[in-house]
A protein has these predicted regions:
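Register position in tetratricopeptide repeats
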Residues: 35-36, 69-70, 99-106
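Helix-start (N-cap) detector for alpha-helical repeat units in TPR-like alpha-solenoids
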Residues: 23-26, 57-58, 91
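Canonical tetratricopeptide repeat
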Residues: 62, 95-99
Length: 106
């Protein structure tokens, strides 16, 4: 399951079209850290990216997926809610709501 989540995270990030400059560097570092199991470093890089672009829903989506993989339900919920708040993509919003429904069942 975790392997699939990280594969999805990698693909999602690769396809992101809104990543520029320093934010892009932080996202690449976050993915690299995930791939070698440095989850704390990955979160650190995602937090830096969110400071650079605090309204980028993709960043919060990646954070939420990472928190889910780490079984950190509370932070996953917070990140999914921010994803919904800033998302302009209907499909991303639907995906976030599905994850929130699942997380709220437990």
């Amino acid at each position: 399951m975790i392997k699939h989540i990280f594969s999805f995270i990698f693909i999602s990030t690769f396809l992101m079209s809104l990543s520029f400059g320093q934010q892009k560097n932080h996202l690449h570092r976050a993915i690299s850290a995930m791939e070698i199991g440095l989850f704390d470093e990955s979160l650190k890089q995602l937090n830096k990216a969110s400071k650079t672009d605090p309204t980028n829903a993709q960043i919060y989506k990646l954070k939420a997926l990472l928190y889910e993989a780490l079984n950190d339900r509370e932070n996953a919920i917070i990140s999914w809610n921010k994803c919904i708040k800033y998302s302009k993509d209907k499909n991303m919003t639907i995906e976030a709501k599905i994850h929130l429904d699942y997380l709220n069942e437990f």
